[in-house]
Amino acid sequence: VDEVSETLSPENSPNCMKKLLPAFPLTSSSSFNARRALVAAVAASPLIPALAQFRVEVSGVGLTQLPIALVPFKGQDAAPQKISAIVQADLERSGQFRGVDASGQALDEASRPDLTLWRQRTADSLVVGSITRLADGRYDIRFRLWDVVRGQDLGGQSYTVPQGDLRLASHRIADYVYEKLTGEKGIFSTRIAYVTKGGNRYSLWVADADGENAQAALASPEPIISPVWSSNGSQLAYVSFESRKPVVYVHNVASGQRRLLANFRGSNSAPAWAPDGNSLAVTLSRDGGSQLYTISSAGGEPRRLTQSSSIDTEPTFSADGSTIFFVSDRGGAPQIYKMGASGGAPTRVTFNGSYNISPSVSGDGRWLAYISRVGGAFKLHVMELATGNVAAITDTTADENPSFAPNSKLIVYATQLGGREALMTTTLDGKIKARLAGQAGDIREPDWGPFQKQ
């Protein structure tokens, strides 16, 4: 486990060069600039690297998992990161892959493997590659993916990266493999935001999807809650109590600059970005009780959406922007409702249980994740929106704040394990869970960021 992650900034992070590796043999091709984990601090505060990284622990067995062998990359023992191990951890965490023993083999992307051997080892797919340190200190990473069953070369890529981007390159490899073998986009190079509390100090963090490379965007002695990504991943909205009341800010991830969005009379809370990035839904008490409003992402006068004497809060948009799901106690207890994004008569969504909160809608529009109180325990549930079928998918008792991965295949949430708060990811059926166990304080309020442009 790395103790300190390298700080990346627009000034010190060189371009990450990627090349497509076509079918055997290798040929050269053009390069492009890959995404950088550029997280600057609020105002004049310096960017703070994580003091303790996460430890990924995967548990459970999926009903259908693709057996894949990842041969240790040639030369990786001399590198600061074990590329094949990172790729394998990513794929296993997705719940759709299981690792096959790849020991005793020495292969790289230029090798033509004996696929009969790998069939005997029950592998359906094979990843081989190499990593070489260049004279300028950067690393050249190359890999190739093989379909063992069909005997096909599925191509590969190469990356030339600085040391600080070795994990990013590994996540890109996992994305490539995942998409080639499942037909769905991989989420391993996306980011998550979350809040930690250590003593009397609160911090807002941005990290890779596996919890590594965490960088602090904000630290405060006052609570920070409700971080939420914009649809293009360039901004985070959040609520800060530094003014001795809840106020909504918008933070530019690349520059570290922030601006005040909502500081009206009373409480300003629960921001949610519209998918087009032009507006946000917020909960305000400026006119009395807590009601839902929309406000331009540039600020200005909010527009009221709900007109009730109850508490309406926790808005979240559907992926197409047409619908807002939210929590209201208008029926006597907190339940999840939905309405048009411009307002209108709400429709109740949840009926199982007397206390349902924290809605999150999947990007494909098929699923609703939320927290339901069951016999005094707070448990993560998933509803299929087309049928209304609901399933509890955790065995913990203090789950909070679910958020879907951008490919709708995983959920990140906060919970309590061993008396401490921690982040977990789970497949939608609850069969594969990964604990992201931090050591820097209680962890809460996760939000999974969108796909990034490559």
Set out the residue ranges of the language-model regions:
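Short beta-strand->alpha-helix linker/helix-N-cap micro-motif
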Residues: 57-117, 127, 132
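Short loop/turn segments that connect beta-strands within beta-propeller blades
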Residues: 149, 208-212, 252-256, 296-300, ...
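Amphipathic beta-strand/beta-sheet edge segments enriched in Tyr/Trp
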Residues: 111-176
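Residue-level detector of Asp-centered blade-edge/turn motifs that repeat once per structural unit
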Residues: 187-188, 231-232, 275-276, 319-320, ...
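N-terminal secretory signal peptides
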Residues: 1-33, 37-47
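A flexible loop/linker signature enriched in serine peptidases of the S9 family
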Residues: 185, 196-203, 219-222, 239-248, ...
